[in-house]
Structure formats: C-alpha cells, structure tokens
A protein has these predicted regions:
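A short, aliphatic-rich beta-strand micro-motif
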Residues: 81-83
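Sensor-regulatory modules in signal-transduction proteins
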Residues: 85-87
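Glycine-rich acetyl-CoA-binding "A-motif" of GNAT/NAT acetyltransferases
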Residues: 91
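Sensory-domain boundary capping and coupling elements
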Residues: 95-98
Length: 130
C-alpha cells in the first residue's frame, strides 16, 4: 500500500477510506490537513467520532454513490463525492473524496488565462498572415 499512499498523497483532493464498520483505514495528506489530524491519529477510529457530521456512513448504508455534495465547514467550501466499496455484491467500505473550492477556483483562473492567451495569439497570427 506504500506506493498507493504516495500516489494518493500527491493529489490535492482529500481522500478518506473506511472499512465496513466505518472505521478509518486511510486518509491522505490533504484530508489530514483539512481535519487537523494525521493518519496515525485517526486510523482505526470510527469516522463519526472524528467527523460527527460525516455523510459517508449514510451512503454506505444505502449503497448509493453521492457526487458533488456542496459543503461549507470551518470557513472552507468544498465538494464531496462518496462511493460505497463493493465486494461480491456487499458493501465492505467506502471512499470519500473532497475537492476544495480554492483548488477549483485556481484551475478555473488558469483556464481563463490560457483562453485569453490563445485569443491573443490567434489575433496576432491573423495579423501576421494577413
């Protein structure tokens, strides 16, 4: 799992994985920073003990994927995606991903800048080519 942990820690989205008893198996660095606890502090603990308002247990009980749930907590806006993990047709855990809006806004700004640059270059090419 070390390589997988390295991969998950490299992304800016928060990742949480729980087992069938809703005990935390893994959180990546982004999720750890968000909740203010390290993986070592939360591993093996009930998700609802660490995050009383967590919705992942509900998604697991219903066996439903829930995507793009907008939340605001501690002054941070984010979107949550929740996925039950199935083995042989049975829910055996869950994964939650958190996309922080500041990351999404940053990407949107970069896309806007690139679109402006492309429009400028298109205009210059038309001038040069007559």
């Amino acid at each position: 799992m070390k390589k997988m942990e390295m991969i998950l820690n490299a992304i800016k989205e928060g990742v949480l994985i729980v087992d069938r008893e809703e005990k935390i198996e893994f959180i990546n660095d982004a999720y750890a920073e968000f909740i203010g606890h390290s993986l070592e502090e939360v591993r093996g603990k009930l998700l609802t003990d660490i995050r009383p308002g967590a919705k992942l247990p509900e998604a697991m009980k219903k066996g439903e994927v829930q995507e793009q749930i907008h939340r605001v907590e501690k002054g941070k806006e984010y979107f949550v995606n929740m996925y039950p993990i199935y083995e042989n047709g049975e829910v055996t855990g869950g994964i939650s991903t958190v996309t922080f809006l500041e990351n999404a806004r940053f990407l949107a700004e970069k896309i806007g800048e690139l679109n402006e640059r492309e429009a400028y270059l298109d205009a210059r090419m038309k001038e040069v080519n007559g």
